């Protein structure tokens, strides 16, 4: 039987911001004494982290990893760029990628509850508290992404600005086109497409753009309106859709043309299945 009440456990959690499991452990170690339990958690580097959680986090890093378990992406924010480049903080971020891959998670709240691969005796939330204590700043896990990597896929990652923007590209049709996938990922970071193709643009976006274009040419003959609108849509697709964009390394060819050229050279039916692009704070 426990030496503490549920009310004491609740008070310890509210006072320290530490997870349920570690609070129970602290109270058991302290034989139900609240003050001793707080001291115990402080010695573990957990108890003072809660005081930092209100601080604003504008800096940080976006990190990505692809291996046999799949592809993972995580954005973790801190208060200053100095800590964003701290080795302790970076090690914590790297461990999150492994946790996402191990548990196949894309949910930040679910990630916080799993046991950390970096420190198996602590949950991710508890390790975050320890890391906050070590670096002296608030840490926020903002978003997470996981997807399996299938056979016959090539995956490319490109990171810009030491993790300020990251793209992952998934090519189907070959497992040997990582260089092409990385080139396209680099292009995505530079050109920031909103959609994969013309066909993937939502209907409401098309209708919005058509209204804007029509208002710009109001009063002109219908055939002129149609011609101008078609031209404006072409320009819109070339700016917003990855496959229609001019390749950043060779503007004479579109991304679709680049893929077609690689497919012809390799004899493999290549296509971009999807991509993920994250920019810090966006």
Swiss-Prot record:
Gene3D superfamilies: 1.10.286.20, DNA helicase RuvA subunit, C-terminal domain, Elongation factor Ts, dimerisation domain. Its main location: cytoplasm. Pfam families: EF_TS. Keywords: Cytoplasm, Elongation factor, Protein biosynthesis. PROSITE patterns: EF_TS_1 (PS01126), EF_TS_2 (PS01127). Residues 80-83 are annotated as: Involved in Mg(2+) ion dislocation from EF-Tu. The keyword Cytoplasm applies. The keyword Cytoplasm applies. Belongs to the EF-Ts family. NCBIfam families: tsf. Associates with the EF-Tu.GDP complex and induces the exchange of GDP to GTP. It remains bound to the aminoacyl-tRNA.EF-Tu.GTP complex up to the GTP hydrolysis stage on the ribosome. This is Elongation factor Ts.
């Amino acid at each position: 039987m426990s030496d503490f009440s549920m009310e004491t456990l609740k008070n310890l959690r509210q006072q320290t911001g530490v997870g349920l499991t570690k609070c129970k452990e602290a109270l058991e170690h302290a034989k139900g004494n609240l003050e001793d339990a707080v001291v115990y958690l402080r010695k573990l580097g957990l108890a003072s982290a809660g005081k930092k959680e209100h601080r604003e986090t504008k800096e940080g890093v976006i990190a990505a990893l692809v291996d046999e378990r799949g592809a993972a992406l995580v954005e973790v924010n801190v208060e200053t760029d100095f800590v964003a480049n701290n080795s302790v903080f970076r090690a914590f971020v790297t461990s999150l990628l492994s946790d996402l891959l191990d548990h196949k998670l894309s949910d930040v709240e679910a990630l916080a509850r799993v046991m950390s691969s970096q420190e198996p005796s602590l949950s991710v939330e508890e390790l975050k508290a320890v890391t906050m204590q070590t670096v002296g700043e608030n840490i926020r896990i903002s978003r997470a992404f996981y997807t399996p990597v299938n056979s016959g896929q090539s995956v490319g990652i490109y990171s810009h600005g030491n993790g300020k923007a990251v793209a992952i590209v998934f090519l189907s049709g070959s497992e040997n086109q990582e260089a092409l996938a990385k080139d396209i990922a680099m292009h995505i970071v530079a050109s920031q497409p909103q959609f994969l193709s013309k066909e993937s643009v939502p209907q409401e976006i098309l209708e919005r753009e058509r209204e804007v274009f029509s208002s710009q040419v109001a009063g002109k003959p219908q055939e002129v309106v149609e011609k101008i609108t078609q031209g404006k849509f072409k320009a819109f697709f070339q700016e917003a859709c990855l496959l229609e964009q001019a390749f950043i390394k060779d503007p004479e060819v579109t991304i679709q043309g680049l893929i077609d050229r690689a497919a012809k050279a390799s004899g493999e039916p290549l296509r971009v299945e999807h991509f993920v692009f994250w920019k810090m704070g966006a």
